[in-house]
């Protein structure tokens, strides 16, 4: 038996003792933690190289991924290589890392990791178990997202890199790499890079005759998806929903539902999300009575480059029905998902998506509070955060604004809500703002342009939930009335002033012009008609099309129709 002290397993924070025997090897931490063991039959290959804490022994196991043992002395190489040769029948390969610092080289897909080589020497390796997602960021660019450590308690409870974690380096530090990008220009033969490594030499020879040229970045992306098990796994998809509209992130995605995760497949980006990342699950009806929103609160948030999306917002039609049969065995349905899922669904799509997400994730569905109904009988209130228009929903224990920027506020964190108007114009009386101030100096959120008719329903909801609120609008009533009266007085005085300045023009207005013919219009009349038409309903129609509700702008539409009816018909000029 060979024993080595002060050895670190898979970047663990504490050292331990490593022992080698004929039956296998083991590592035991010096403090608390579980002992890691590896059977001799599971040792596939071994590599020796310089590392962070001295020299490292990397073991490529047959079924447990990559195992890294760091902290050896240079003199330990002879003992290790002799033990591996005698007990496991394996030669320990001594490898030197590339130290030139070049950022170009060759990517090699091995059994358990992606290796980036410079001049045939490894610069760095990325285990497939550390890769959470990959996307084509451009024509010749591939983005690789690395898995994040989200549960520090579990990381400290288990030895880093144990087989329970599938080789994950759970004991990561506060700073860690989350994304890297590869620029891969040109084209390659598919058989040279993909099929050869996957199916071996015999099948590769057959494929070479039918080989076709393919974009190198696309082939790299497909290989990485397959190696890291990010893409489709045959037979594992329980259900698939096609072309689902997502408001955040914006686009249409196909949703593939798996046992422990779901995948969003879009034209540009693909996402793989664990059900354990779903912290909140909302079902929110829109005010148009034709759509509903399904909102998933994610932690860690979804990442798209430097942009993070803590909420996933999808929009579904209420009247769209589907028939779906789950791709699941009866045994699995009875043992694990009994009373959670049904073998077959035939109902509106938003209900099917909700039930399957709830059954697979185990999360409770949160719906709008019964204590709040808007003036128009809806669950949401139309408002804005800065320039972004959306809907604010009032739930039993929280408030949520969707779709962008999705904002979630817990009722228990609210210190006071202030209802106020902005500005002194008469138009301000039609809308008001609410400012939600949070406790312990956590900041505030302002929601603007709320319809004046929603004041009473909001006050009743705040009283029902014992939320402190302050109404500052009553203090502004006198100022608004004075402003309105001033506007009327100024308007009338202006009219009198204009009439006084016109002089004899008033007499011309009342007298009959004998030269005027009713059948013809002057150039001046056409000019004024043209100006009137350009300032008409064009902008209003665009605003109505852009609005979500649609029903709140009926008055504007009526005004537009009336103005069009009263407008005289223009007659074209005829040259003499």
UniProtKB/Swiss-Prot annotation:
Family, similarity comment: Belongs to the SSRP1 family.
Broad class of the protein's primary localization: nucleus
UniProt feature, compositional bias: Basic and acidic residues: 193-203, 496-505
Function: Component of the FACT complex, a general chromatin factor that acts to reorganize nucleosomes. The FACT complex is involved in multiple processes that require DNA as a template such as mRNA elongation, DNA replication and DNA repair. During transcription elongation the FACT complex acts as a histone chaperone that both destabilizes and restores nucleosomal structure.
Ranges of compositional bias, category Acidic residues: 204-213, 506-528, 542-564
One biological process term in Gene Ontology: subtelomeric heterochromatin formation
Organism this protein belongs to: Aspergillus oryzae (strain ATCC 42149 / RIB 40) (Yellow koji mold)
Record keywords: Chromosome, DNA damage, DNA repair, DNA replication, Nucleus, Transcription, Transcription regulation
Top-rank taxon, per record: Eukaryota
Protein name, per record: FACT complex subunit pob3
Subunit architecture: Forms a stable heterodimer with spt16. The spt16-pob3 dimer weakly associates with multiple molecules of nhp6 to form the FACT complex.
Gene Ontology cellular-component annotations: chromosome, telomeric region; FACT complex
């Amino acid at each position: 038996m060979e024993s080595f002290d002060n050895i670190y397993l898979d970047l663990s924070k504490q050292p331990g003792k490593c022992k080698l025997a004929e039956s296998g090897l083991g590592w035991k931490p010096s403090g608390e933690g579980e002992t890691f063991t590896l059977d001799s039959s599971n040792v596939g290959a071994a590599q020796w190289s310089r590392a962070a804490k001295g020299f490292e022994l990397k073991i490529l196991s047959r079924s447990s991924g990559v195992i890294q043992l760091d902290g050896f002395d240079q003199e330990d190489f002879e003992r290790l290589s002799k033990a591996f040769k005698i007990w496991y029948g394996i030669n320990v390969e001594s490898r030197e890392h590339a130290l030139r610092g070049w950022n170009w080289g060759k990517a090699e897909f091995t059994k358990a990791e992606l290796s980036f080589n410079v001049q045939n020497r490894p610069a760095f390796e990325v285990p497939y178990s550390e890769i959470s997602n990959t996307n084509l960021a451009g024509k010749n660019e591939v983005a690789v997202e690395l898995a994040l450590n989200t549960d520090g308690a579990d990381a400290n409870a288990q030895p880093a890199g144990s087989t329970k974690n599938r080789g994950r380096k759970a004991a990561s530090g506060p700073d860690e790499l989350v994304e890297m990008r590869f620029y891969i220009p040109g084209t390659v033969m598919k058989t040279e890079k993909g099929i050869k490594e996957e199916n071996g030499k015999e099948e590769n020879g057959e494929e070479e005759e039918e080989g076709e040229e393919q974009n190198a970045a696309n082939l790299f992306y497909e290989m990485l998806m397959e190696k890291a098990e990010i893409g489709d796994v045959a037979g594992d998809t329980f259900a698939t929903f096609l072309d689902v509209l997502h408001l955040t992130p914006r686009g249409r995605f196909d949703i593939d539902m798996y046992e422990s995760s779901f995948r969003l497949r879009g034209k540009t980006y693909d996402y793989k999300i664990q059900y354990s990342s779903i912290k909140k699950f909302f079902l929110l009806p829109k005010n148009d009575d034709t759509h509903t929103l399904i909102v998933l609160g994610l932690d860690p948030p979804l990442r798209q480059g430097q942009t993070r999306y803590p909420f996933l917002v999808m929009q579904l039609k209420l009247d769209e029905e589907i028939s779906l049969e789950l791709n699941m065995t009866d045994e699995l349905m009875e043992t694990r998902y009994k009373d959670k899922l049904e073998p077959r669904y035939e109902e509106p799509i938003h209900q099917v998506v909700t039930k399957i997400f709830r059954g697979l994730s185990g999360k409770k569905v949160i719906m709008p509070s019964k204590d709040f109904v808007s003036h128009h009988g809806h669950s949401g209130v139309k408002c804005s955060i800065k320039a972004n228009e959306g809907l604010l929903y009032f739930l039993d224990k929280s408030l949520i604004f969707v779709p962008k920027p999705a904002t979630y506020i817990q009722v228990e964190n609210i210190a006071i809500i202030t209802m106020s108007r902005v500005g002194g114009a008469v138009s301000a009386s039609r809308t008001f703002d609410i400012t939600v101030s949070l406790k312990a100096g956590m900041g505030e959120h302002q929601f603007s342009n709320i319809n004046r008719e929603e004041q009473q329903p909001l006050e009743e909801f705040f009283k029902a939930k014992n939320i402190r609120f302050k109404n500052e609008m009553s203090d502004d009533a006198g100022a608004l009335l004075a402003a309105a009266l001033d506007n009327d007085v100024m308007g009338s005085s202006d009219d009198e002033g204009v009439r006084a300045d016109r002089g004899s023009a008033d007499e011309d207005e009342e007298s009959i012009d004998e030269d005027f013919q009713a059948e013809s219009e002057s150039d001046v009349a056409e000019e004024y008609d043209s100006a009137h038409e350009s300032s008409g309903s064009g902008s209003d129609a665009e605003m109505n099309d852009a609005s979500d509700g649609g029903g709140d702008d009926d008055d504007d539409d009526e005004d537009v129709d009336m103005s069009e009816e009263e407008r005289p018909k223009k007659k074209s000029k005829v040259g003499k």
